[in-house]
Amino acid sequence: MQILLANPRGFCAGVDRAISIVENALAIYGAPIYVRHEVVHNRYVVDSLRERGAIFIEQISEVPDGAILIFSAHGVSQAVRNEAKSRDLTVFDATCPLVTKVHMEVARASRRGEESILIGHAGHPEVEGTMGQYSNPEGGMYLVESPDDVWKLTVKNEEKLSFMTQTTLSVDDTSDVIDALRKRFPKIVGPRKDDICYATTNRQEAVRALAEQAEVVLVVGSKNSSNSNRLAELAQRMGKRAFLIDDAKDIQEEWVKEVKCVGVTAGASAPDILVQNVVARLQQLGGGEAIPLEGREENIVFEVPKELRVDIREVD
């Protein structure tokens, strides 16, 4: 059985930065460090940080005075940010800079009183944070997930309208929603390029190439990871059996029985150790050496806040 590895796969710059912020805060300040929401959507990462003293909470009221608080990579609303400011807390922001860019687009529209439409998944923390940047009662902020939502939507002023997107969406699905928005509201204004981030786009492109060759595709990622779910859906849409797995223990032998080629990829919040474990398990089931496919090279790095720029090896 041939094993193919998608390229790129796994950690993106925003996830790397967010995890480093929590790790460095633990090294400098010691446990406990409070993190609002899972810093990234990966069970292995969250469990390992929890073991080292990170406490994951959903409400600022759960954080004691004088504590260290970190906002997750998904970003937070202005209301959450203001609540944290009103408390005696030291706050570090692990929001992905590409999410912050979308926040700034929404804030600009809010200041101008223009209505805004966000393409995204209801209930996702990134969507909640992005919607929470809009505060102008003269305008309005709306969420759509599908072309059907667009056709049902009514706004106050079609002449002054803009749209933004969640950063971890399906490129193909989002294109369909944008097409519907432009037909429904001909004067709507959007970003020069949709807000789907480079890592999401690259990983979807890579899984498309992977699924062209593999009979079965394994996506390493947690069930609550938006970008990981989109990878599995894309492979399935291409007619391949695809499974979203947290780790090697989730692999069922019958998935790869009599399969000649299996493909492996990982969502942007899944560490490479999990991919290595999956490859090792596939090799136990008869797989050969893992062969990486060619793909886009990624060299983007996002710096951590200057207060946390320390070599953690220097910290006792």
From Swiss-Prot:
List of catalytic residues: E126
Record flagged with keyword Iron: yes
Result for mutant: S225C: Loss of catalytic activity
GO molecular function, one term: 4 iron, 4 sulfur cluster binding
Cofactor note: Was shown to bind 1 [3Fe-4S] cluster per subunit. However, it initially contains a [4Fe-4S] cluster which easily degrades into a [3Fe-4S] form in the presence of oxygen.
Reported regulation of activity: Addition of Ca(2+), Mg(2+), Mn(2+), Ni(2+), Co(2+) or Fe(2+) decreases the catalytic activity. Addition of Zn(2+) results in complete loss of activity. Is potently inhibited by substrate analogs in which the hydroxy group in HMBPP is replaced by an amino or thiol group.
Name of the molecule in the record: 4-hydroxy-3-methylbut-2-enyl diphosphate reductase
Cofactor: [4Fe-4S] cluster
Chain's gene name: ispH
Species name: Escherichia coli (strain K12)
Family the entry assigns: Belongs to the IspH family.
Residues bound to [4Fe-4S] cluster: C12, C96, C197
Record EC number: 1.17.7.4
Effect recorded for V99A: No effect on catalytic activity
Top EC class of this enzyme: oxidoreductase
Outcome after substituting E126 to D/Q: Loss of catalytic activity
Annotated Gene Ontology cellular component terms: cytosol
Metabolic or biological pathway: Isoprenoid biosynthesis; dimethylallyl diphosphate biosynthesis; dimethylallyl diphosphate from (2E)-4-hydroxy-3-methylbutenyl diphosphate: step 1/1; Isoprenoid biosynthesis; isopentenyl diphosphate biosynthesis via DXP pathway; isopentenyl diphosphate from 1-deoxy-D-xylulose 5-phosphate: step 6/6
